[in-house]
Every structure is written in C-alpha cells, then in structure tokens.
Amino acid sequence: MAVPKRKTSPSRRGMRRSADALKQPTYVEDKDSGELRRPHHLDLKTGMYRGRQILKPKAEA
C-alpha cells in the first residue's frame, strides 16, 4: 500500500485545491439586442450566432 513519505503542508494542500473552485460564468453584451449572453453561445432571445440566424426568434408573449 502506498504511504506518503512526508506530510503535506497546508500551503501545498491549498495550492492543489485551488483548481477545484467553481468559476463564475462570464457574460458579454450582445451587439444587436444588448442582452447578456455567454461567449461562443447563441443568443436564445434572437436566435442569432455569429451574425447568422440559427433558430427562429421567440415570439413576444
């Protein structure tokens, strides 16, 4: 069975765990509609992605 040769210091343990934190998602303002959306994702309100119509826009209710 594998046994560590040295005790892991709190600093090293913290550095290892630093990559485990959840990142806050980034948002960009859409040029056409002004709505916030994720980068590299299509805008669900307008149905546009990179200047092209991908989906039909949602009907205003």
Swiss-Prot record:
Basic and acidic residues composition bias: residue spans: 28-44
Q: Which Gene3D superfamilies does the annotation name?
A: Single helix bin (1.20.5.640)
Biased composition annotated in UniProt, kind: Basic residues: 1-16
> What keyword terms does UniProt attach to this protein?
Ribonucleoprotein, Ribosomal protein
Q: Where is this region: Disordered?
A: 1-61
Which GO molecular function terms does the record list? Answer: structural constituent of ribosome
Any one biological process term the GO annotation gives: translation
Answer yes or no on keyword Glycoprotein: no
Instruction: Name the Pfam families for this protein.
Output: Ribosomal_L32p (PF01783)
What cellular-component terms does GO give this entry? large ribosomal subunit
Query: Which superkingdom heads the taxonomic lineage of this protein's source?
Result: Bacteria
HAMAP family in alphabetical order: Ribosomal_bL32 (MF_00340)
Instruction: Report the family membership.
Output: Belongs to the bacterial ribosomal protein bL32 family.
Q: Return the protein name.
A: Large ribosomal subunit protein bL32
